[in-house]
UniProtKB/Swiss-Prot annotation:
Brain and stomach. This is Cholecystokinin receptor. It is a multi-pass membrane protein. Residues 95-104, 165-184, 262-343, 404-453 are cytoplasmic. It is found in: Cell membrane. Residues 1-64, 132-142, 206-237, 365-379 are extracellular.
Length: 453
């Protein structure tokens, strides 16, 4: 009986050691890593020979062909959409002089960083995961990791800059005109690239290729971060979580929240104008909500406004009716545009958290409890988390540019030279704030330029 227990314990230990000896090359962890591994695995592990083939065949089957092809197709679709969308944005913004505005300068920088995310992150994440081996060498390992982190950082900082610029243009239009110039925008963009380049230097220093024994007795390679201590690793991921997710997320929530509040006030203003216009048909004097003379606080006061009957008597009833109808229709169009803007702002904030929160949480979890995170996220979960973060590179062009009517017209004017109406387009009331419109509480007609068409 004792001998049977001993054999059972030996068998369990044998299986455990065989599992740990083959953990390498199965998981991508770091935001900029391309083929991570668990700390328990070393090049000489285990220090004695084990015949693990039967156990591996029985306990650790290879991924199904369906799972493999699903991952390839999803990565390919996101990659193509990101490259195609961001390339089109760069071409349109560079070739069209009418779109060279302050906010569009940030959008151009955002498109460049998103294009880098697609080109530098996705291939060097997918290929090593499929092959379970990093085949590109030490130089590519360091360079790819560095530019991955750089592109993600620049993209995040650009989103923050866009939210601050839009907030200033809408909520503090007079003050923002003093400093909102293209030269100032260029300096901010340059600062985001320089700051991101400095922040991501640890990827150049600590990213290395590490060898490990593969299942077919070949020597494999992983591109991974090798930290001098556990404390340094934890501090690094907490830093990334703070400056690339937590602070940008809070800034975007506050900025777009204040913009939504200002637009809601504009909606109330337009509704009061509609009521006043309809009441005027019956010759009734109604209180009209108008902005106060104080540009700083955004308050509104009630002012009783009576039409001059002598002035109105010079107009025929048919002319008055047409003017009132046009005024009401125009006001309702502005009202709908503002509501679309608010919905779009909610989508922007939601997509930022949906795309980036999982990867930052996974990286921080891995830094503090690597074994637990490894067991939970191995395989499909971590692949999906990385894919979700890369989705932002193809979502940003849709939200910030292709939902803008003026940009769509500029796109057609750039690539459809045979269609004259597309080349000679005019501005509309539904242009986005990226068109550089001067937004003011006193002129709610331009606020609708923030939203999609």
């Amino acid at each position: 009986m004792e001998s049977l227990r001993s054999l059972s314990n030996i068998s369990a230990l044998h299986e455990l050691l065989c599992r740990y000896s083959n953990l390498s090359g199965t998981l991508t962890w770091n935001l900029s890593s391309t083929n991570g591994t668990h700390n328990l695995t070393t090049a000489n592990w285990p220090p004695w020979n084990l015949n693990c083939t039967p156990i591996l065949d029985r306990k650790k089957p290879s991924p199904s062909d369906l799972n493999l092809w699903v991952r390839i197709v999803m990565y390919s679709v996101i990659f193509l959409l990101s490259v195609f969308g961001n390339t089109l944005i760069i071409i349109v913004l560079v070739m069209n002089k009418r779109l060279r505005t302050i906010t569009n300068s940030f959008l151009l920088s955002l498109a460049l960083s998103d294009l880098m995310v697609a080109v530098l992150c996705m291939p060097f994440t997918l290929i090593p995961n499929l092959m379970e081996n990093f085949i590109f060498g030490e130089v590519i390992c360091r360079a790819a990791a560095y530019f991955m982190g750089l592109s993600v950082s620049v993209s995040t900082f650009n989103l923050v800059a866009i939210s601050i610029e839009r907030y200033s243009a809408i909520c503090n239009p007079l003050k923002s005109r003093v400093w909102q110039t293209r030269s100032h925008a260029y300096r901010v963009i340059a600062a985001t690239w320089v700051l991101s380049s400095i922040i991501m230097i640890p990827y150049l220093v600590y990213n290395k290729t590490v060898t490990f024994p593969m299942k077919d007795r070949r020597v494999g390679h992983q591109c991974r971060l090798v930290w001098p201590s556990k404390q340094v690793q934890q501090a690094w991921y907490v830093l990334l979580l703070t400056i690339l997710f937590f602070i940008p997320g809070v800034v975007m929530i506050v900025a777009y929240g204040l913009i939504s509040r200002e637009l809601y006030r504009g909606i109330q203003f337009e509704m009061d104008l509609n009521k006043e216009a309809k009441a005027h048909k019956n010759g009734v004097s109604t209180p009209t909500t108008i902005p106060s003379g104080d540009e700083g606080d955004g308050c509104y006061i009630q002012v009783t406004k009576r039409r001059n009957t002598m002035e109105m008597s010079t107009l025929t009833p048919s002319v008055c009716t047409k003017m009132d109808r046009a005024r009401i229709n125009n006001s309702e169009a502005k009202l709908m545009a503002k509501k679309r803007v608010i919905r779009m702002l909610i989508v922007i904030v939601a997509m930022f958290f949906i795309c980036w929160m999982p990867i930052f949480v996974a990286n921080t979890w891995k830094a503090f409890d690597e074994l637990s995170a490894f067991n939970t996220l191995t395989g499909a979960p971590i692949s999906f988390i990385h894919l979700l973060s890369y989705t932002s590179a193809c979502v940003n062009p849709l939200i910030y540019c292709f939902m803008n009517k003026r940009f769509r017209k500029a796109f057609l004017g750039t690539f459809s030279s045979c269609i004259k109406p597309c080349r000679n387009f005019r501005d509309t009331d539904e242009d986005i704030a990226a068109t550089g419109a001067s937004l003011s509480k006193f002129s709610y007609t331009t606020v609708s330029s923030l939203g999609p068409a």
